[in-house]
């Protein structure tokens, strides 16, 4: 999308056609809002990005959590778990190439400037934030090791919360996103690979090698062919939301009081890369939650096996 997506968005807006995509690149997504939001409003069309696995489960999960909190949500921690079958799993190299471009062009994106343009108003915040976590830590509730999730989910949710606050006058919730890895060894291996990968991307000769040999350079975590049909059929995902806030629904909420309520939401679905992503693509410039929250999206997602539900809070061990 960074290389070719703008031409499609521009053509859609100019010709009065709405546009839905499965992009996962925050800089591109937010620059499209900055450039085309007003024109889209004038034309009466919708530009809705990140409608694949990035970031329907997370964005709509946060919306589901807020709707079912029965109080005021102040922050949430989210955890994505990819469950593979006996055949293993390889992600498509397109995601890998996007990651290379994202890291390489990060300094030139001007993301801070873009965000000031599309979200000029400061949102109300409280001193109650999600716990500070180390880069690598063990989640004793989900029985997995956690690393920061580098996808678009956090930025998409932040924009949805801004829209919620500005348009619907709802208290904005903060979010921290993580990816779960089953073993400490593989979590450390993934962390080490990411560190080396980020350094290698900065130099043209190593970047060319990374781009040319995605399978070898990622230890076959990414392949040009993507997962096999059997791998996709065996794979599933879980997305967990641990919300914290207050029982009260007053506006403004009792921000000086310590949060007194917790709600847990779980989303389950099939293979994230293909089956869930195709199910997520549903029929100004919006996030998925801003565009779809008052529709029958949850029923639509359920028909593809992507189900949201509240679950009892789990105790730490």
Region spans (language model):
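Active-site Tyr-X1-5-Lys
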Residues: 32-39, 60-69
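C-terminal catalytic/substrate-binding lobe primarily of soluble NAD(P)-dependent oxidoreductases
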Residues: 44, 66-317
């Amino acid at each position: 999308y960074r290389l070719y997506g703008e031409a499609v968005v521009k053509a859609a807006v100019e010709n009065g056609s709405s546009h839905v995509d499965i992009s996962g690149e925050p800089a591109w997504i937010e620059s499209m809002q900055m450039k085309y939001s007003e024109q889209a409003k004038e034309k009466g069309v919708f530009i809705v990005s990140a409608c694949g696995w990035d970031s329907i489960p997370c964005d709509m999960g946060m919306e589901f959590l807020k709707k079912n909190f029965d109080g005021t949500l102040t922050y949430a921690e989210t955890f994505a778990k990819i469950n593979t079958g006996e055949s293993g799993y390889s992600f498509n190299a397109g995601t890998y190439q996007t990651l290379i471009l994202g890291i390489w062009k990060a300094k030139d994106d001007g993301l801070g400037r873009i965000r000031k343009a599309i979200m000029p108003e400061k949102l109300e915040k409280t001193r109650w934030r999600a716990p500070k976590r180390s880069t690598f830590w063990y989640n004793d509730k989900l029985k997995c090791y956690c690393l920061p999730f580098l996808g678009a989910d956090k930025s998409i949710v932040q924009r949805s919360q801004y829209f919620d606050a500005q348009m619907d006058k709802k208290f904005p919730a903060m979010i921290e996103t993580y990816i779960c890895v089953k073993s400490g060894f593989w979590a450390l291996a993934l962390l080490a690979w990411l560190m080396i990968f980020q350094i290698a991307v900065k130099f043209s000769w190593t970047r060319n090698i990374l781009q040319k040999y995605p399978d070898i350079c990622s230890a076959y975590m990414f392949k040009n062919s993507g997962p096999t049909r059997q791998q996709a059929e065996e794979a599933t995902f879980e997305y967990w939301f641990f919300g914290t806030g207050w029982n009260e629904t007053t506006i403004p909420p009792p921000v000086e009081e310590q949060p007194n309520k917790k709600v847990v939401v779980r989303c389950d679905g099939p293979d994230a890369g293909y089956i869930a992503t195709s199910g997520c693509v549903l029929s100004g410039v919006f996030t998925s939650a801003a565009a779809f929250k008052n529709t029958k999206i949850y029923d639509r997602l359920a028909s593809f096996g992507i189900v949201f539900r509240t679950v009892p809070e789990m105790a730490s061990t």
